[in-house]
């Protein structure tokens, strides 16, 4: 399962990559636009009540990706991870308190993976994988803006912004 949210593109890429690798993926989010993008990758879109509210977990997953960037999201992700499973926190949590249910992690033998990827290290492998698997990463792009209009582009509420500029020189 992927818990989408403020991490927007992170969760969508996670869902798309997992489906491309053959996984069945539930994508949980409150944003209809992101739910449609997740569905276009082949994930099962599940709408939640709002950005900060989550349903009580009714299914348990071997792997859960948290891209919510909210404290209630990380808690939901952990509580949705099955015994012996792995919960990956791939989004930023800026608050001083996230309320991670440590006892739940320990009693259910859940592996919690926290940290950001370092693109410089993995980029050649990732680009090779995208090419070999014909992964449609562009599905996540919701706005393409000319370089000169970058301030306007950054002012829009969008899932994934791409700035385009003609080659220099």
Regions found by a protein language model. Give the residues of each.
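Mid-domain Rossmann-like dinucleotide-binding core that forms the NAD(H)/NADP(H) cofactor-binding site
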Residues: 1-51
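Residues in the short beta-alpha loop(s) of Rossmann-like NAD(P)-binding domains
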Residues: 30-31, 93, 118
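C-terminal hydrophobic helical "lid"/dimerization subdomain
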Residues: 32, 75-78, 120-169
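Short acidic-hydrophobic, aromatic-tinged amphipathic segments that line or gate anion-handling sites
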Residues: 44-52, 142-149
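A short acidic, Gly/Pro-enriched loop at the edge of an enzyme's catalytic core
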Residues: 55-64
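Helix-to-beta-strand junctions that scaffold the AdoMet/dcAdoMet cofactor pocket
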Residues: 81-83
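Glycine-centered, small-residue-biased loops immediately flanking beta-strands
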Residues: 85-86, 110
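Rossmann-fold NAD(P)-binding glycine/threonine-rich loop
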Residues: 91-109, 121-128
């Amino acid at each position: 399962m992927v818990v989408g949210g403020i991490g927007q593109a992170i969760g969508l890429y996670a869902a798309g990559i997992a489906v491309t690798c053959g996984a069945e993926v539930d994508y949980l989010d409150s944003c209809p636009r992101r739910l449609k993008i997740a569905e276009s990758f082949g994930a099962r879109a599940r709408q939640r009540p709002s950005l900060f509210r989550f349903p009580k977990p009714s299914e348990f997953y071997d792997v859960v990706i948290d891209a919510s960037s909210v404290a209630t999201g990380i808690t939901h992700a952990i509580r949705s991870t099955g015994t012996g499973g792995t919960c990956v926190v791939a989004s930023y949590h800026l608050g001083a308190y996230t309320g991670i249910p440590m006892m739940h992690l320990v009693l259910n033998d859940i592996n919690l993976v926290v940290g950001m990827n370092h693109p410089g290290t993995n980029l050649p492998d990732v680009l090779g994988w995208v090419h070999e698997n014909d992964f449609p990463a562009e599905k996540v792009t919701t706005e393409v803006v000319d370089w000169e209009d970058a301030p306007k582009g950054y002012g829009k509420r969008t899932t994934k912004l791409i700035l385009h500029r003609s080659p220099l020189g």
